[in-house]
Design a protein with these regions (language model features):
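Signature of extracytoplasmic/envelope-associated structural regions
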Residues: 1-290
Length: 290
């Protein structure tokens, strides 16, 4: 593939540290503009019709401790960049962002496969090339820039606990967990004609409560579903705990403990030649700590 940038020639960094296990990256921006039309002529010009904003989505296999999980709270903005080389050339290009905030963290896991993580990022700063210095890209292969700790989990190092389930007779075969982190950007009017900072938000707030959603897929033997109308006299609540450790030691790669999570949906399915399965969905809301 002449003049193509192949996947093994690409690296992704968050705040200067490389991420391992990245499977795909998608970054984009759109410019909201509105045409100016005048009577008797039509279009004459255009104006900006909203704040400038971009989006990034990063999908990766969970093979070590996930630094992106720490971005779900009230953390400062972070930057990220994809660096790439053109095949057969020493030229280096980049596509990155700064002032990004994580808005969604999704974990999925099935029997026989490694856990996968997908993160959505809203960008309120600039997006494009040349957003990192040449010296930063020059050190991309250094020990400080590359995450060399590979410690993937296996099925024996992952534990899932649910108050409602007897996991000895009802087998969990898949799980999905999502943390939604809605952000609200606050903009201010410029104080002078040369106030360049007016194009960026003065602050970005985390909107509470945070919503956590956990879905479990079960192959059942003796599990009994709940009655729909029992919700009217008291929704079922229980604890759901997910712990994922590395296979070579007890290092925690990801951990989610949902105390008093609310059971909000169940579905039952069965087919010829298959087994009876139930899908359960729990929700948990997290308020701001006072």
């Amino acid at each position: 593939m002449k003049s193509a940038s192949l996947s093994y020639e690409q690296n992704f960094y968050v705040n200067g540290t490389g991420l391992s296990g990245v499977q795909s990256i998608n970054g984009s921006y759109g410019i909201p503009e509105r045409p100016i039309n005048i009577l008797g002529h039509g279009y004459v010009n255009h104006i900006l019709d909203g704040p400038l904003q971009g989006d990034f989505t990063i999908s990766r296999v969970l093979i070590n401790q996930d630094a992106m999980l720490n971005m779900t709270g009230e953390n400062a903005a972070f930057s990220g960049v994809v660096s790439y080389n053109t095949y057969g050339s020493s030229n280096t290009g980049s596509f990155g962002f700064y002032s990004g905030y994580l808005t969604s963290y999704k974990l999925s896991c099935d029997v026989g496969s490694l856990p996968e993580v997908s993160t959505d990022i809203s960008v309120y700063g600039d997006i494009g090339p040349n957003l990192v210095s040449a010296s930063e890209l020059a050190g991309k292969d250094s020990d400080s820039a590359v995450d060399n700790t590979i410690n993937p989990p296996n099925q024996g190092s992952m534990t899932i606990y649910c108050d409602e389930l007897n996991t000895a007779s009802n087998r969990i075969v898949a799980l999905n967990h999502e943390i939604a982190c809605q952000r609200e950007a606050i903009y201010a009017l410029p104080t002078s004609a040369s106030d360049a900072q007016a194009k960026y938000p003065v602050q970005v707030d985390l909107v509470y409560p945070l919503e956590q959603t956990t879905s479990l897929s079960l192959e059942i033997d003796d599990y009994q579903t709940k009655n729909l109308y029992d919700y009217l006299t008291g929704v079922y609540t229980g604890n759901v705990n997910i712990d994922i450790n590395g296979s070579s030691n007890d290092a925690t790669l990801a951990s989610f403990h949902l105390d008093n999570a609310r059971l909000v949906s169940e579905s039952f399915s069965s087919s010829v030649g298959g087994v009876a399965t139930v899908n359960m969905t729990f929700k948990k809301y997290i308020n701001k700590r006072r």
